[in-house]
Each structure stands twice: as C-alpha cells, then as structure tokens.
C-alpha cells in the first residue's frame, strides 16, 4: 500500500475512533447506567477490532503512517 493511502486511512480510522469515544460520553450523560454499560461494552468491542485488526496491521506494514504518540503495545 502506498504511504499516502496508508496515512489517509489512518486519519479516517482515528477520526472514527474519536467519534465512537464521543458517542460513549453522550450515552453516559443521557442514559440509565445499565444501558450505558451495554453500549460502552459494544463500542469497546468495535474500537478493539479497529485498533487490533485494522490499525495495528496497517502500521506494521506502513510505520510512516503511524501518528505521533501512537502506542500499539
């Protein structure tokens, strides 16, 4: 994969992770605790898949696409 595409994908996927994280905060502020816990668990799974199955392999093959401060350990 070319570096430009890897960097673009990295940016898009990190934006998605940020939006998912923000959605958890919205639910935390507006929903009952049980509903929040279920939502947070589900979103955590989605975020885990994006990081472990998509971003980490992307960065392993294209280290130049890894954002500054990204810790994959």
Whereabouts are the PLM-identified features?
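N-terminal acidic leader/helix
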Residues: 1-33
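An interfacial alpha-helical scaffold signature
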Residues: 26, 72-73
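Short, charge-rich amphipathic interface segments used for partner binding and complex assembly
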Residues: 33-66
């Amino acid at each position: 994969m070319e570096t430009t595409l890897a960097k673009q994908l990295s940016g898009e996927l990190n934006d998605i992770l940020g939006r998912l994280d923000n959605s958890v905060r919205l639910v935390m502020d507006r929903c009952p605790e049980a509903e929040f816990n279920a939502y947070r668990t589900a979103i955590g799974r989605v975020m885990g898949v994006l990081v472990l199955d998509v971003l980490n392999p992307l960065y392993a093959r294209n280290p130049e696409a890894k954002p500054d401060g990204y810790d994959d350990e």
